[in-house]
């Protein structure tokens, strides 16, 4: 048997050995690959690359009708390096992750009105923020009269899950005092007027009335930071 043939057999033997070992350790390999993918996804943070200013991104722009190519309404706003979201439709929390926007650092959610497609991602986004973030209080969710009922409903729906995850991960990862969300309710202002909801480090967030009959109440939001403003009206 010549040297070339011996090398081929040796290479074949090594390849076969790798396949055997890989197959026998497939569960551990898959778990490790998934963990690497998750770590890379959650460590991606586009905010670090942004300059100080007011930045806006669409994390969803679909309708209530199911679509494989659209997600529920969601607008991300970053000001002074902090992330806020207006409306949180289905799949929008995952879109934020894919886009590199740090859900774990989410400072607050603003809801324009209570149509299902504008709120049905709230449970997912508050859980991702809780498990991945470093907060000691629940996620603030701003909305007009009625937001208390919406937030209470989501918190109740996820209450058992909070207990399971806290028991599994412990207080270091999932402290119960930061679980879920906290409603920040306000009365819809009269037409032509605004109500100030946030004033922090140069950022001002105000709510104003919009018409979306028969939905009532319905509001829009204006974010102002460093002489720049963005207005989000919902539907």
Q: Where are the regions a protein language model picked out?
A:
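Short, intrinsically disordered, charge-balanced linker/junction segments flanking boundaries
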Residues: 232-235
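Binuclear metal-dependent hydrolase catalytic cores
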Residues: 2-230
């Amino acid at each position: 048997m010549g040297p070339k043939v011996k090398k081929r057999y040796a290479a074949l033997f090594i390849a076969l050995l790798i396949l055997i070992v890989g197959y026998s350790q497939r569960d551990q390999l898959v778990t490790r690959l998934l963990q690497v993918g998750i770590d890379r996804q959650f460590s991606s943070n586009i905010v670090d690359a942004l300059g100080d200013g007011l930045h806006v991104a669409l994390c969803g722009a679909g309708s209530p009708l199911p679509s494989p190519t659209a997600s529920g309404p969601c607008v991300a706003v970053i000001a002074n390096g902090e992330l806020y979201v207006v409306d949180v439709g289905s799949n929008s929390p995952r879109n934020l992750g894919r886009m590199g926007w740090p859900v774990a650092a989410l400072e607050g959610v603003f809801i324009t009105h209570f149509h299902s497609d504008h709120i049905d991602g709230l449970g997912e986004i508050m859980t991702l923020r809780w498990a991945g973030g470093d907060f000691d209080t629940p996620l603030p969710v701003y909305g007009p009269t009625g937001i208390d009922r919406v937030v209470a409903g989501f918190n109740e729906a996820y209450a058992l899950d909070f207990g399971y995850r806290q028991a599994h991960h412990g207080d270091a990862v999932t402290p119960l005092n930061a679980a879920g969300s906290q409603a920040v309710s306000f009365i819809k202002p009269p037409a032509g007027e605004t109500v100030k909801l946030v004033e922090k480090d140069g950022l001002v967030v105000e709510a104003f009335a919009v018409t979306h009959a028969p939905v009532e109440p319905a509001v829009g939001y204006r974010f102002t930071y460093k002489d720049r403003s963005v207005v989000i009206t919902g539907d």
